[in-house]
Amino acid sequence: DEEFDLILTDPPYGDMMGKERTGQSKKHNDDSAPRNYTDSSHDLGNMESEQFLENLRLILERASTRLKKKGYMVVSCKDFQPQPGKTNLLHADIINEIVKIEGMEYKGMRIWHDQAMSLFPFGYPYSFIMNQLHQYILIFRKEG
């Protein structure tokens, strides 16, 4: 029944790993096959967006019961590339889910720039899809 001051997580981003990685094929000897963590339907990394967000909230809601009052929950995430008809702002979707947890308040974000990554214009010269060099560090505090 120990309580914690901080919960820190970098969850899988829904079914992102299950998608073909055409832009990464040169790094992987022309292998663009999906690289799922597991085959389990219970794995967050195998879930469609809405199911992923709901299950992530349920997991973090359960974890929040072990968080001390005034304790912090920090979630690292990266947005998906925009698709036709979808903005794919995962960080905003995660914020909207976590604030549904009783007592959890959104306190802001920090941007982490991954300096180990190189900027690469995927799709050039036919289209321009910039890879992302940053992640969002979302900060929440248990107030109630």
Predicted regions and their residues:
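Class I S-adenosyl-L-methionine-dependent methyltransferase catalytic core
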Residues: 1-144
